[in-house]
Amino acid sequence: MNFINYITAILLSLDPAYSDKENWEERTARMEIIATAIDDASSKTTCSDKYDVPGCEKTWPGDKKSIAMLLITKGFWESKFAKNVHEGNCRPYECDSFTSNGRTIHKARSLWQIQKTGLVSKEEYNQMKSATLSSTTIAANVAVRYLALGMKSCKTIRGAISIYGGARVCNWSGAAPREAFYRRIISMSDEQIASSVNTRKNKLENRLKSEIIVKNEKK
């Protein structure tokens, strides 16, 4: 399978956010958008594929797969790739919210929960509010900047995760389960991925069927 299909399969192998009400076809289509964005960001930071051109500056020291799996890891732990977060419709308690003059304001945007800092331009930040391919690709590329900065500072995957999470040390305790998740998905065989995707598909379809039954019983 090509790399975008590979990323899509990894994404589909993960538990969906409980709030997501997509059917399998809808979820697959959205995961394909995320996978395409991750593919672009991973290629750009490693100067591979269409970015393998004179003048490209490699910002990630590892290969394309390593940064792609790290983007999946961060996206899952930051938002579980929830549909409402992807679309920019965070609930009052999500996306690093606070209240000002009776208004709920969300500081973090996109599946990677990116806040406005010096690593993000105003234009980029303003565009990270939808589930379009363009918006998702911008967010994935910005997320890479944070991860690359952490890797440059700490020289380890755990360090990159730690710095991304706001820690000022390279061995933040909260990074351990995230690193374990990263190690698990990057080492999955094609057979393991396919089996996990099939399991998630069956669980999702059964859940949706159960919800329909309950809804009909309440009528």
Could you tell me what each predicted segment is?
Residues F3, L11-K219:
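Catalytic glycan-binding domains that act on GlcNAc-containing polysaccharides
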